[in-house]
Amino acid sequence: EPRGTLPAWRINPPPPVEELLAAYRDDEAASGVGWSHLAAINLIETHFGSVNGASSAGAQGPMQFMPSTFAAYGMGGDIRSPRDSIMAAGNYLAANGFANNPDHALFRYNNADAYVRAVNDYAAAMAADPAAIGAFYRWDVYYVSTAGDVLLPIGYAAESPIPVGDYLAAHPQ
């Protein structure tokens, strides 16, 4: 739903795609959750970790975990670490039956049918052509606002929500 303010986020360059791929593949071997599903979640949640900031619900880190959930599945890791967060996502999905019912596990991760479809669609695209991750990786970050889609470039930083009009006046698009 479009909002009249831009979020209290920081947009940083994501980790190198090679590092992310290594983390996805390592976790696939450990948890049985396909690398492309882990990558799709990372893309949807934080554009591969470039979006830094808590969600409106309080979720944190590259894979957007609630701190209590991360504590249960993160094996003592750092919620803000891409590798630790990806590992926790694999652990969470595996514990929620990904091997037998991926859609159920994905729904437990984010209880929205549209989310499950989006993860599956992006995962299928990356599984069919692993080079697709490079294309997704290079996407810009846009935020849906009442003024339309607003580009949030690398370097965007807001400590608190910013009225869209104020931001666009200072950063015409």
Language model regions located:
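Catalytic glycan-binding domains that act on GlcNAc-containing polysaccharides
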Residues: 1-150
